[in-house]
Regions:
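Helix-breaking motifs and short loop linkers at transmembrane-helix boundaries and internal kinks
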Residues: 49, 81, 102-108, 119, ...
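Conserved MFS/SLC helix-loop-helix module at the cytosolic interface between two early adjacent transmembrane helices
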Residues: 68-107
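Cytoplasmic membrane-interface "Motif A"-like loop-to-helix N-cap segments
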Residues: 79-89, 282-296
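Cytoplasmic helix-loop-helix junction between adjacent transmembrane helices
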Residues: 112-151
Length: 417
């Protein structure tokens, strides 16, 4: 029998799940597509004869598509409402997944990848705008953590489940299934997410909307935090989302399915850590200190990967530690939200996301070029030095951005915590 004390808790959980669930599922599609190449990238590269540079470019174009949409996306969210924008993105994303699945060669594969990136570009930003509209500011980091955590189910599906389905029906068949699931989730969002309502930016002219972008760029602390967005998430997306699979294959001999299960463990650790970091920021002393701690832990794990010879079990353990360390993303996101007044919410958070996705595009492109510059071994695998270069680049990039961020002060105001 349920006690009176348990009933409010159960009711609160159901209400929270009903609110965040459809948004998280749609964001999960984006997470799946971001990280799928970490498992099936070697298979696609072998089938279509792609070099490491080409594979890095293919993965990074998804993020470049995000970059080019962020400013107009922020204006659209503030003017027309996040739900409308997200539903338009579902149509484009599903079409892009379908094109990707049926691509006969590199050019069509690239076109499909870009379409999916354009379509998915609103899924997280639109969800954050809805959270900012529907929930109090002091709960934003918590809900951002829930959204990132539950949405990372897509990251989990892009590991062992994707590997198993690919082994059964091939990567093309797997992506056709994902296209159908995307449409179904879009219908759930259309039915279950609260309707858009007029915002402070609804009646703005285009000139006023663009002026709002400039105002957002001038907020104190914007640029150091922008750089932390660029370096932080790109470390995870470049390691787990792209090179961890080849690293596990080339250095430790793991096949497709083994790679999938190892990446599942790392991604599951990240999911749990995302929700934990979202709650820890107050206990750790606020946004700034929490971000410094998470970034320092991430840099340390990258340096260990670069310089310490690891056995197979230790390598898996380090990958899990890295995934936990880099999961401070909800705090970075909440710090970004705290910089902007309500009327600039859409533009502000999408500008920060421009840094996030731009950082991934740059890091994945550079690391692919580094891998090819060092070159393959006679058997076709990449040597340890190639992966060492990847880890060192990511550690240096994050370290530089952290040094610039070091002087930032804790934000104050109605959205601070």
């Amino acid at each position: 029998m349920t006690s009176p004390q348990q009933q409010p808790i159960a009711t609160s959980f159901v209400v929270t799940l009903a609110f965040i669930g459809p948004l998280a599922l749609l964001y999960g599609v984006s997470q799946f597509l971001r990280n799928a190449l970490g498992v099936i990238g070697p298979d696609i590269a072998q089938e279509l004869s792609l070099s490491a540079t080409a594979l890095g470019l293919l993965s990074s174009l998804f993020f470049l598509a995000f970059v080019v949409t962020q400013i107009p996306l922020g204006i659209a969210i503030d003017r027309f409402g996040p739900k409308k924008v997200m539903l338009g993105g579902v149509t484009l994303a599903a079409a892009g997944i379908f094109v990707f699945a049926l691509a006969p060669g590199r050019e069509v594969l690239i076109a499909g990848r870009i379409m999916t990136g354009l379509g998915c570009s609103s899924f997280f930003m639109g969800a954050l705008a809805i959270v900012a509209r529907e929930r109090p500011p002091h709960r934003f980091a918590h809900y951002a953590g829930l959204l990132l955590g539950f949405g990372s189910i897509g990251t989990l599906v892009a590991t062992a489940p994707l590997a198993e389905v690919t082994a059964w029906i091939g990567w093309r068949g797997a992506f056709l299934i994902v296209a159908a699931i995307t449409v179904l989730i879009g219908l759930l969002v259309a039915w279950g997410v609260p309707a858009d309502r007029p915002s402070a930016g609804h009646g703005e002219s285009w000139a006023q909307a663009i002026a709002g972008v400039r105002e957002a760029l001038r907020q104190p602390g914007f640029w150091p935090l922008f750089l932390m967005h660029a370096a932080g998430y790109s470390a995870f997306a470049t390691v787990v989302g792209l090179w961890a699979g080849p690293w596990l294959r080339d250095l430790y001999g793991h096949d497709l399915q083994a790679r999938g299960w190892i990446l599942l463990a790392a991604s599951l650790a990240q999911v749990v850590a995302l929700m934990a970091w979202g709650r820890l920021q107050v206990a750790l002393g606020g946004y700034v200190r929490s971000i410094r701690i998470g970034a320092a832990m991430t840099i340390a794990s990258l340096l260990v990967a670069a310089f310490v010879p690891l056995g197979p079990v230790a390598a898996i353990g380090l990958l899990i530690v890295f995934s936990v360390s880099v999961a401070y993303t909800p705090i970075t996101t909440a710090h970004g939200r705290a910089l902007f007044p309500d009327r600039l919410t859409g533009r502000g958070i999408t500008l920060m996301n421009l840094g996030t996705m731009g950082g991934v595009f740059v890091s994945q492109s550079i690391t692919g070029a580094l891998m090819d510059w060092i070159g393959r071994l006679p058997g076709g695998a990449y040597p340890p030095a190639a992966y060492q270069a990847v880890f060192l680049y990511l550690a240096a990039f994050l370290g530089l951005c952290l040094a610039i961020y070091a002087g930032v002060r804790e934000p104050k105001g109605p959205h601070a915590r």
